[in-house]
Amino acid sequence: MPFSLCAQGEVDKMLTNLHWLGHASFRLDASRIIYFDPWKLPKDSRKAGIIFISHDHFDHFSKDDIALISTKETVLVTDKSVGRQLEGKLVCKEIKSLKPGNKIEVSNGVKVQAVYSYNLNKEFHPKEDGKLGFIVTIDGISIYHAGDTDYIPEMKDYACDIALLPVSGTYVMTADEAANAALAIKPRAAIPMHYGDIVGSNSDAEVFRDSLKDKVEVRILKKEK
């Protein structure tokens, strides 16, 4: 379970500071600048306080993009595979390599629970690989970045204020499956991701939204350039 759940007004405020950068990449402008799976970033991107990398596939783990936003004060949180590849090769304060089930305090006021992220009936993301989703708590808000996953049994035990869920199908769950995941998790707001690049289209995000009408609030974020 995450560390806290909060009021809707606080969630709405946090959502105004959450920026979809395309695919599974997000930036959160909170008390720390946080990135999830940064990829194809513009050269003038803001520097990161914390970077979360879910797994080692190229569209989630971009060494060039990580280097672009890292400083000597940046903390990177990731799985064991990415941690091994970056050890000693990145200018940053620290690399924290986690496995599903780990809970840590990344820095003052920022906590993370590493959770499972895997496929049930596809070969792309085996459970035994230890790829990650993250439930991050910052400024009293819990945000779940699911990584590349299907709708998995563990999700019924996850809770968060904001859920970032893949919807494209092919490598991850479909929009309908993602809607079922959202119903299991019951976030205050759900945001579709993992579409519009490589696989998936705007229609997947719309199917996800329509499937959850009057059940879970869905925000389709505009991709920032």
How would you label these PLM feature ranges?
Residues 18, 90-110, 179, 183-225:
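Binuclear metal-ion centers of metallo-dependent hydrolases, dominated by the metallo-beta-lactamase
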